Structures are given as C-alpha cells and as structure tokens.
C-alpha cells in the first residue's frame, strides 16, 4: 500500500463513502445509505487512530480524529429514524454528513492555511444543505440562510487574515508563518481568530447561533454543535499553540475579554430562553468561552484540559440534542419548555438522557462537564489568568439555573400533565447512541483518568 493511501486512508474512506452514498441516492428510490455510511466510518476508525494526520499530525489532530468518528456515528444513528418519520429521509443526508465530517477532519489535520480554509468550507457547505434538508420547513430554510450569509462574511475575514500573514511571513505553513513577529502578522492573526470565532460562536460573532439551532432538525443541530465546533476548536488550539510571544502580548488581552464575554452571554442568554433548542444553543456558546480560556493556556498545560473538555462537550451536546429529537413528536421538534412538563415520568429513559446532558452542560457532578470545568479553571489559574478564571466560575454558577429550570419541568408532578406526550420511536441505533452518550458522560465524570491518561500519552508522544 502506497504511503499516500496510508496517510490519507481515513480521508479516503469518508470521501468515497460519501460518493457511494450519493450515487445510491440516484440509483435507488428507497433510502439505503445508513449502512454504507456507517460502514465507511467504521472502516476509517482504525486509520483515524493510526494516522495522526497527513503531515505526521499533532496530538490534537490525532485525538480529534477519534472524537470525530464518535460524533459522526452518533449523528447517523440519531438521524436515521428521525428523518424517516418526518418524511425527509434520503441517502443524500448521509453522503453530505460524511463529506462534512471529511471537511472537519481536514480542518483538524491542517498544518497550512489553505487546508484550514478548505476543510472549514467543505464542512460548512454540507451543513448548509443538512440544515435545510426538509424542504417544506420554512424555519429550516431560514436557518440555513442565517448560517450561510454571515458565514460567507466570516470566510472573507478569515481569508484576508491569512493573506496578511502570508504577506508578512512568505509561508503558508501555520507554524512557520506565525513564528514571524510583526504588526502585520498580529493583524492577520486577529482576523483569522475572528473567522474561527464565528464558527465557534464566540461573542460578539455569536448572534446566528440560536436561530440556526432552533430551525435545524435536532440531530443536525447536534452535529453542527458538536462536530463543527470541535473541528474549529481543534484549529484554534493548533493556532494558539504556534503564536509567538510578541503576538500573545498584543492579542491575549482581547481574547480574555472575548472569553469572558462569551461565557457571560451564553449563560445569561440561556437563563432567559423559553425555547429548549435556543437554551441549548446559548449553552453551547458558553462552553466555547471555556474552551477559549483553555486555548489561551495551551502552552501552559491547558492543552490537555481543553481536549478533555472538548470530548465532554461533544458528548453532552449530542446527548442533549439527541434527547430533544427523541422526545419530539412526528410533526416537529418539541421546543417549548412548557411542553416538557412531566416527561420524566412519561418517558423516563429519554428524559434521563436529557437530564444527564443538562447536568453536564451546567457542570454538575458526577458528570464529565464538572471534571472538564475543573480542569479548565485549574489550567487558567496555573497560567496566571486568575481574574478570568474567577469570572468563569461565576458564570458557571449562573449557568446552573437554566439546567435546573428545564430539569424542574421534566420532573414536575405527573398529576399536572393533562395528556401523555406522544413521541416517535428512536429506533435501536438511536437508542444505543443515546445510551452510549449518557454512559460516557457519567463514566468520564466518575473515572476521568481513563481519558486523561490517553490524552497525556498523546502529548508525551508529541
């Protein structure tokens, strides 16, 4: 087997798997893409761990490659029965999902600016179509446009920043170009961080997030929140690890303000929401503020904390959005908090998964979210960001209220429910995915060293 095939084996599995599924969508009238899409991801899984990346890879890229497979597999499992019951099932969904996952993998693997931009846009273009997958749903079409239009502007800002960095350094490699000090490099890096910050929903470029998450189908919102943000976070961590000390002195104060603003906007915004999907959207914004705080300390021990929190975030968002989809009726997603009253008694298994996801998002023990926040705050304190860490702890306490609000609705007295809420069957694959997510959140909360040891080994081999 050639070196090219070995190096790019995971990418080839996703690329040809997506192509095969799209060809099936044209050749068959009955959707059958679930099985080849799942097979493509399982085929790529050994290579994702064996190959850290096309250029030798980094610990971040190697870790993210494994995480991506879990995110994509869980999304396919959650999407299968959901799309079928809502009348928009088709093989094209799975093909687009595989190609979007390919873009995310390229983004995480990127060692040069061109690959970073290509991966970012490949993932985004497929997500635009997935968000608007149900053509008779005006809310989904509107959400896709609200993601596409500001996304195009963010790409322009990102590319302009890359052009400035290239003009200052003469190199398209991320590490080499950021090593060149100077105001032009710092200006370009600032624009790049704004572009990546849009994908991460960092304040103040976060305004698209609640509308898009509310309009997207719940499993697609789960993939958008966990996969897209994990890919962008991997790129952010890589870039931050290569920034010169001179550029840090110029830009890190602005990043600290952005992290604090993101944590505050996300948690306070979630408290004020009556829509469950908008609540989860604001919660995901807040989580990215914690990731940004860890990214600032990536060279001071924050890298391991960031990767643990990234894995926990992916699991908690998949669990929460997946449970929302599983608790929804055939017509549309159950989105009003009032509609969740007493579902903990009517549908205890699905409500329990949502409760675990919410508890982890709020950082309550014994979940992975609690351990992740503890590690992130510890890394920030060790790096000297005492004020930012203290502010983050305050916002995390505020964030507990939105979780308790929805949890209180879920477990309101059964006697107050006038009519049992009908939901669709999640199917064996969806049920298994929800169970794995919930077990993972509790397992990592009780035994965090299992994942922390693997992450430490990756950094030790860097």
From Swiss-Prot:
Residue spans making up a coiled coil are: none
Question: How does the entry describe its membrane topology?
Answer: Multi-pass membrane protein
A GO cellular-component term linked to this record: plasma membrane
Keyword Cell inner membrane tagged: yes
**One biological process GO term for this chain?**
ATP synthesis coupled electron transport
**According to its UniProt record, which reaction does this protein catalyse?**
a quinone + NADH + 5 H(+)(in) = a quinol + NAD(+) + 4 H(+)(out)
Keywords associated with the record: Cell inner membrane, Cell membrane, Membrane, NAD, Quinone, Translocase, Transmembrane, Transmembrane helix, Transport, Ubiquinone
- The answer on whether this UniProt entry bears the keyword Cell membrane reads yes
Q: What are the disulphide bonds in this sequence? A: none
- Name the residues that span the membrane: 4-24, 32-52, 60-80, 88-108, 113-133, 148-168, 178-198, 220-240, 251-271, 279-299, 307-327, 351-371, 374-394, 416-436, 439-459
Q: How does it assemble?
A: NDH-1 is composed of 14 different subunits. Subunits NuoA, H, J, K, L, M, N constitute the membrane sector of the complex.
Q: What is this protein called?
A: NADH-quinone oxidoreductase subunit N 1
